Regions:
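Nucleic-acid nuclease catalytic cores
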Residues: 81, 87-177
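Metal-dependent nuclease catalytic cores that hydrolyze phosphodiester bonds in DNA/RNA
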Residues: 1-108
């Protein structure tokens, strides 16, 4: 597949895909017109994310390396953003990490305030994070996890071809604005 690479000054905010898919008007107000109103729900969401977003914090638990607030980008999709958490699981296959022994597989984890939804804006955001990581780390990431604060549980999300194509299509649409 041939594609053009975006310049950094044309990058969109990765998190915008969630707003765009949920409500294009909301996305335009936040990301184009820079209008944002805090409310109880957004403040609760910010508090939940503060636990995940401790920039540069790395934590090792046995064969698990946890990186918080990891910056990611994709020149192919023209986006940049931050993963709440990326877990690197040590195993028999995967990628090598600088300064670490062995091979690791990456699993992005996105924190959400509420509970699982019927539609897929959260899934698209998580898939976009995985696709950025794949481009940056030259690997394949088959799944990630959404952690929902309201139910205090993770939901595993598989990244199939349909989800990946939808992410690419939506970012291409967003770039036209």
């Amino acid at each position: 597949r041939s594609f053009a690479l975006y310049n950094e000054e044309d990058f969109l905010q990765l998190s915008g895909i969630q707003h765009y898919e949920f409500c294009r008007r909301q996305w335009a107000l936040i990301h184009i017109e820079m209008q944002w109103q805090e409310n109880v729900r957004t403040v609760e969401g910010k508090i939940l994310h503060e636990n995940a977003h401790n920039p540069g914090m790395k934590e090792k638990r046995g064969d698990l390396l946890i990186v918080r607030a990891m910056p990611v980008h994709s020149r192919e999709m023209g986006v940049s953003g931050e993963c709440d958490v990326v877990e690197f699981h040590k195993g028999k296959d995967g990628i090598s990490l600088a300064g670490k022994e062995g091979l690791y597989t990456a699993v992005p984890v996105e924190y959400k305030r509420g509970k699982p939804k019927e539609d897929d804006p959260d899934i698209l955001q998580l898939a976009a994070q995985a696709m950025c990581l794949e481009e940056m780390l030259c690997c394949t990431i088959p799944y990630g996890c959404l952690y929902y604060g309201e139910i205090r549980r993770r939901v595993k999300v598989e990244f199939d071809t349909a989800v990946r194509e939808k992410v690419r299509k939506i970012f291409a649409e967003m770039h036209r604005y």
